[in-house]
């Protein structure tokens, strides 16, 4: 699915991504010499409030091996950004124990669906089973009343 690209917003994301990588101690520039790398990073840090100039910095200074990772990160961020706008596409997160996730994953694979679809299916099956059980209990009570009279 294609999402609209918003240059200013995405340049800000790219700047943030690069700064976070730099703070984590990763090499973000293509330079081997540390003084050149430090100079390039200081230039990048000055661009915080000029997001569109980040693209120019990326073309001039960014390490080649970071290009693919940056594009993937921005694509994922764009998807999350646009999905968060609508309640039905907004993602929620839940914590599962590993064994619970494993059982759910196995069941989802058996059903040939996603984890979310499997949860939805299992909940509807449980509800249906509960209703059937209540109906059987009511029938048993009615039958026992008829037989005791």
UniProtKB/Swiss-Prot annotation:
Major subcellular site: cytoplasm
GO molecular function per UniProt: sequence-specific DNA binding
Swiss-Prot/TrEMBL keywords: Cell cycle, Cell division, Cytoplasm, DNA-binding
InterPro entries assigned: Arc_rbn_hlx_hlx, MatP, MatP_C, MatP_N, MatP_N_sf
Location in the cell: Cytoplasm
Gene3D superfamilies xref list: MatP, N-terminal domain (1.20.1270.380), Met repressor-like (1.10.1220.10)
Biological process annotations from GO: cell division; regulation of DNA-templated transcription
GO CC field: cytoplasm
HAMAP family the record matches: MatP
Family: Belongs to the MatP family.
Function of the protein: Required for spatial organization of the terminus region of the chromosome (Ter macrodomain) during the cell cycle. Prevents early segregation of duplicated Ter macrodomains during cell division. Binds specifically to matS, which is a 13 bp signature motif repeated within the Ter macrodomain.
Record text on subunit structure and interactions: Homodimer.
Protein name: Macrodomain Ter protein
Organism phylogeny: Bacteria, Pseudomonadati, Pseudomonadota, Gammaproteobacteria, Vibrionales
